């Protein structure tokens, strides 16, 4: 898979906001973003539902705190305890009700002056609904043995209701050696 340097432009802000605290990375996968965050001097708590992904992350980035967790369940962090949360393509596996509960958990855990950096599958993705025969709910599909949600701009804005959206842009990245359309956002809790 191609390395994706999407965090580079955000690193100065992440460093400033996370000074003295931890960056929570939801869905760390093999640890590419984790490595970038650690190289920038951040203290990272990397999470993933997959023990295999956590093992890969641990091998590639040995000095990181790892937690196996399901993003669809309540997060094991205190209220308003995290200055930065990064969630790159890790919030699209859930029904809409669970997705909105995740948004509430993100707000609960983030400090009042904290930031959320997130990327979501776009409905303009080249592989939108790939290999799917079953739409479970609008823009949410059964894909082989998993589920996958795709977001249009109104869905991203609904997910971020109660947030001050500082940045929202649709981009094309490379994933699995193919183009992939994603929404990228940076948001802060609204007053």
Residue map of PLM features:
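A short glycine-rich, Lys/Arg-flanked "PGG" loop and its adjoining helix->strand segment in the class I
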Residues: 100-112
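A short His-aromatic
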Residues: 92-94
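Short, solvent-exposed loop/turn segments at secondary-structure boundaries
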Residues: 97-98, 179
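A short beta-strand submotif of the Rossmann-like class I SAM-dependent methyltransferase core
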Residues: 87-90
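Class I (Rossmann-like) S-adenosyl-L-methionine-dependent methyltransferase catalytic domain
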Residues: 1-23, 29-74, 117-191
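Conserved catalytic-core motifs of eukaryotic protein kinase domains, centered on the activation segment
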Residues: 96-97, 129
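A short acidic, Gly/Pro-enriched loop at the edge of an enzyme's catalytic core
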Residues: 75-85
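Surface-exposed loop/turn positions
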Residues: 21, 81, 113-114
């Amino acid at each position: 898979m191609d390395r994706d340097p999407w965090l580079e432009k955000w690193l100065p802000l992440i460093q400033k906001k996370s000074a003295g605290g931890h960056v929570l990375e939801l869905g760390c996968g093999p640890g590419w973003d984790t490595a970038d965050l650690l190289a920038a001097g951040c203290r990272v708590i990397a999470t993933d539902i997959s023990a295999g992904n956590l093992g890969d992350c641990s091998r590639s980035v040995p000095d990181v705190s790892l937690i196996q967790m399901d993003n669809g369940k309540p997060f094991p962090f205190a209220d308003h305890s995290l200055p930065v949360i990064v969630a790159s393509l890790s919030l699209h596996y859930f029904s809409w009700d669970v997705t909105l509960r995740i948004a509430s958990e993100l707000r609960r855990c983030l400090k009042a002056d904290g930031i959320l950096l997130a990327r979501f599958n776009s409905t303009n993705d080249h592989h939108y609904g790939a290999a799917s025969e079953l739409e479970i709910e609008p823009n949410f599909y059964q894909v082989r043995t998993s589920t996958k949600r795709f977001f249009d701009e109104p869905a991203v804005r609904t997910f971020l209701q109660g947030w001050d959206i500082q940045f929202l842009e649709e981009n094309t990245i490379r994933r699995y050696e193919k183009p992939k359309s994603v929404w990228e956002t940076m948001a802060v809790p609204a007053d």
